[in-house]
Curated annotation (Swiss-Prot):
Keywords noted in UniProt: ATP-binding, Chaperone, Nucleotide-binding
Function summary: Chaperone involved in the maturation of iron-sulfur cluster-containing proteins. Has a low intrinsic ATPase activity which is markedly stimulated by HscB.
Cited PANTHER family: HEAT SHOCK PROTEIN 70KDA
Full protein name: Chaperone protein HscA homolog
InterPro entries in the cross-refs: ATPase_NBD, Heat_shock_70_CS, HscA_NBD, HSP70_C_sf, HSP70_peptide-bd_sf, Hsp_70_fam, ISC_FeS_clus_asmbl_HscA
CDD domains the record matches: ASKHA_NBD_HSP70_HscA
Membrane-spanning parts: none
Native organism: Pseudomonas fluorescens (strain ATCC BAA-477 / NRRL B-23932 / Pf-5)
Signal peptide: none
């Protein structure tokens, strides 16, 4: 059946003319480019017949080297050879310093706290390094397809935040690529397996690459992909397996933990070779310098068990978020070269109670799926109809309200693209400006969420508190990028911002935000209720104080005023504590003792308005 076609700007106005578009898997360890040829999606090889391009960039004084030769030069030229740059995309220098032991580079801070890597050609940003990899893939594709590309679908981990996604788009632009869309890697894998055409039900995509882990739970209905939930870890992957083996070698060989960059690189290469050998063998002899020892698969499994357990914990969380049971998952797709590790496959099979799908090369499956989507977005009709992909945002988006509270506007796991609006008002009389603080996270207090951006809405007409109506609109596009606007509906004044944070989340912060939201859910609810009661109490105190200053002497006797002021003082003292119930009850008492005063003020206002006017004037 024909499904709803995704139509985006730039599609071909000539549907019978095939436009050249590719899918790119920009990976931590390796990258690939794929395209549809003769109706089949396949990876494109270079002149030597190699499909996989190592994500390695080596800088010389007068040229740039990309790929396998650059990777092999890493031990001898570690400071000019950049590996695993995907881990640095969208991050700040402070984040990078936490990875210092794993990254043998010299870093300098650039604009917006971006880390630059010192090379023989000068400082290079992660965006520039990634652009070199993308440039080679673009040139390979144009040579293989015999023409200029109209664009590419580039895959990213589902857990990439706004900064990391924007950095990826910037790298593509620098490489001369038009980005048709950023596509979550797990979703691309589902497309590659043709699950949109042959299956209905719930599918899990387990994606363990070189530097990142993603789990996505998809529901497939009539060819439509709906991502029910996503999870993962931006700092978990095959690189960590290598570091675990390297640690085993250091301990066994009695090496110093403080190694120079070249030694670190050669050590990691030996560790990686051992890991790959254990994929098919029960044991491997590891040789490092004069030291040699046998590493068995059982010992290797024990080394990586904590990391495998971390991935399964994220899987259980994603299944819970999707509101499905484990036995409802009908298929598990394995993605990423690290899923070749036998212990990983065993653990996934044990958890889901079924053997995972591994028929398509896990290193190629993402690029193959991205190419299918790229062909559709380029305007080329897909045999069997088009497909609709519904991705989701990984963390809730919202803004700060009075009392330091997080008001969620778009909940996590909402399908994108999406636009949501919510109305807010002013807190004080005569307020003419409002600060809009955009946040990301699952907790109730802003101190426990991540700040994304701030902007001011100015020019609000002065009114009494609560009279102005400000509509705040959140929009998340198909690439997961956020824009926020605020508009005062009466005057039409408006302000907006596109959220492009200068760096991303620190290692473990994404997973920790979700973990904390569950762990502290009860405490957060109590804290939110307390803050709301404190805000209500403060608002009442300010209103009563304003009324006393304006009309207290005229409308109250000394005893009445003293009673009100005593109740205000007691409420102020309670607000400094944490007894929410006491604050609520005292707020009610203050409201009650001021009822008569409020009625007198209203009568006085009405009398003043009617003074000197006859009945006929009022009726007119």
């Amino acid at each position: 059946m024909a499904l709803l076609q995704i139509a985006e700007p730039g599609q071909s106005p000539q549907p019978h003319q095939r436009r050249l578009a590719v899918g790119i898997d920009l990976g931590t360890t390796n990258s690939l480019v794929a395209a549809l040829r003769s109706g089949l999606s396949e990876p494109l090889a270079d002149a030597q017949g190699q499909v996989i391009l190592p994500s390695a960039v080596r800088y010389h004084a007068d040229r740039v080297e990309v790929g396998e030769s650059a990777r092999l030069a890493a031990p001898t030229d570690p400071l000019n050879t950049v590996l695993s740059v995907k881990r640095l995309m969208g991050r700040g220098l402070s984040d990078v310093k936490q990875l210092g032991e794993q990254l043998p580079y010299r870093f300098v801070e650039g604009e917006s706290h971006m880390p630059f890597i010192e090379t023989i050609q000068g400082p290079k940003s992660p965006v520039e390094v990634s652009a070199e990899v993308l440039k080679v893939l673009r040139q390979r594709a144009e040579a293989a397809l015999g023409g200029e590309l109209v664009g590419a679908v580039i895959t990213v981990p589902a857990y990439f935040d706004d900064a990391q996604r924007q950095a990826t788009k910037d790298a593509a632009k620098l490489a001369g690529l038009n980005v048709l869309r950023l596509l979550n890697e797990p979703t691309a894998a589902a497309v590659a397996y043709g699950l949109d055409q042959h299956a209905e039900g719930v599918v899990a995509i387990y994606d363990l690459g070189g530097g990142t882990f993603d789990i996505s739970i998809l529901r497939l209905t009539g060819g439509v992909f709906e991502v029910l939930a996503t999870g993962g870890d931006t700092a978990l992957g095959g690189d960590d397996f290598d570091h675990a083996i390297a640690g085993w070698i250091i301990e066994g060989a009695g090496l110093s933990a403080d190694l120079d960059p070249g030694t670190q690189r050669s050590l990691l290469q030996a560790a990686c070779a051992a890991k790959e050998a254990l994929t098919g063998a029960a044991s491997v002899e590891v040789v490092y310098g004069d030291w040699r020892a046998t590493l068995t698969r059982d010992a290797f499994d024990a080394l990586i068990e904590p990391m495998v357990a971390r991935s399964l914990k994220a899987c259980r969380r994603a299944v819970r978020d999707s509101n499905v049971e484990l036995d409802e998952v009908q298929a598990v797709v394995m993605v990423g070269g690290s899923t070749r590790v036998p212990r990983v496959r065993e653990a996934v099979a044990e958890m889901f109670g079924r053997q995972p799908l591994t028929e398509i090369d896990p290193d190629q499956v993402v690029a193959i799926g991205a190419a299918i989507q790229a062909d559709t977005l380029a305007g080329n009709k897909r045999e069997g109809g088009e497909l609709l992909l519904l991705d989701v945002i990984p963390l809730s988006l919202g803004l700060e309200t009075m009392g330091g509270l997080m008001e969620k506007v778009i909940p996590r796991n909402t399908t994108i693209p999406v636009a949501r609006a919510q109305d807010f008002t002013t807190y004080k009389d005569g307020q003419t400006a409002m600060m809009v603080h955009v946040l990301q996270g699952e907790r109730e207090l802003i101190s426990d969420c991540r700040s994304l951006a701030r902007f001011e809405l100015r020019g609000i007409p002065p009114m009494v508190a609560g009279a102005a109506k400000i509509r705040v609109t959140f929009q998340v596009d198909a690439d997961g990028l956020l824009s926020v606007s605020a508009r005062e509906l009466g005057s039409g004044v408006e302000a907006s911002i596109q959220v492009k944070p200068s760096y991303g989340l620190t290692d473990g912060e994404i997973a920790k935000m979700l973990k904390d939201s569950f762990q502290y859910a009860g405490d957060d609810k109590v804290a939110r209720v307390l803050r709301e009661q404190q805000v209500d109490a403060q608002r009442l105190i300010e209103a009563v104080q304003g009324a006393l200053d304006a009309d207290g002497e005229r409308l109250l006797d000394a005893e009445e005023r003293m009673v009100i002021e005593l109740q205000m003082q007691e409420l102020s003292e309670l607000m400094r504590g944490t007894d929410g119930y006491a604050i609520e009850q005292q707020t009610k008492r203050l409201s009650q003792v001021t009822d008569a005063f409020a009625a007198r003020r209203l009568d006085s206002t009405v009398k003043a308005a009617l003074a000197g006017r006859n009945l006929n004037e009022i009726e007119e």
